[in-house]
């Protein structure tokens, strides 16, 4: 269900909503594309306010309507963010993978996948399983390398971790 206000107290969100509404009126799109974007915009607004259940409902509806793979990748990415936030890491990884299938140029998805893998590696260490931890850390390294390859100036902490752990080649 589209939000009636559409604009919250955040200046950036207000600006985004205003620009989005203007673009919806002037760019030639089908009614389905406009409706999908409206749900996506409402999902982003709900997500920024911490209303994750509402955000997911809007994103799922946007996915039902959106046909463009590139646009779908961002919807899937945002669904992954919510699952990450909720501690549902397996679901989050699934949505990040699905986003990357449609758009392999999402460094933030690679980064988030790396963060989850690194976290799981730390959990394995706490549980005393260094072999499993090493596998998770190696997977994190691969994802961070992909993120860094796409945006070399970003993810400085990840670059430092890769160097310190001798995983950067």
UniProtKB/Swiss-Prot annotation:
Keywords: Chloroplast, Membrane, Photosynthesis, Plastid, Repeat, Thylakoid, TPR repeat. Belongs to the Ycf3 family. It is found in: Plastid, Chloroplast thylakoid membrane. This is Photosystem I assembly protein Ycf3. Essential for the assembly of the photosystem I (PSI) complex. May act as a chaperone-like factor to guide the assembly of the PSI subunits. It is a peripheral membrane protein. The gene is ycf3. SUPFAM superfamilies: TPR-like. One of its GO terms (biological process) is photosynthesis. TPR repeats lie at residues 36-69, 73-106, 121-154. Disulfide bonds: none annotated. One of its GO terms (cellular component) is chloroplast thylakoid membrane.
């Amino acid at each position: 269900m589209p939000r009636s206000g559409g604009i919250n107290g955040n200046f950036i969100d207000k600006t985004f909503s205003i620009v989005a509404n203007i673009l919806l009126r002037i760019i030639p799109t089908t009614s389905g594309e406009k409706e999908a974007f409206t749900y996506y915009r409402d999902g982003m607004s709900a997500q920024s306010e911490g209303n994750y259940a509402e955000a997911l409902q809007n994103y799922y509806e946007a996915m039902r309507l959106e046909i463009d793979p590139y646009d779908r990748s961002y919807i899937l990415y945002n669904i992954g963010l919510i699952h990450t936030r909720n501690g549902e890491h397996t679901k989050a990884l699934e949505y990040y993978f699905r986003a990357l299938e449609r758009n392999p140029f999402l460094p933030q998805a690679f980064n988030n996948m790396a963060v989850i893998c690194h976290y799981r590696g730390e959990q394995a260490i706490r549980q005393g399983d260094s072999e499993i931890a090493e596998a998770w850390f190696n997977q994190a390294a691969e994802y961070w390398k992909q993120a860094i390859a796409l945006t070399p100036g970003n993810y400085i902490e990840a670059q430092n971790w890769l160097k310190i752990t001798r995983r950067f080649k």
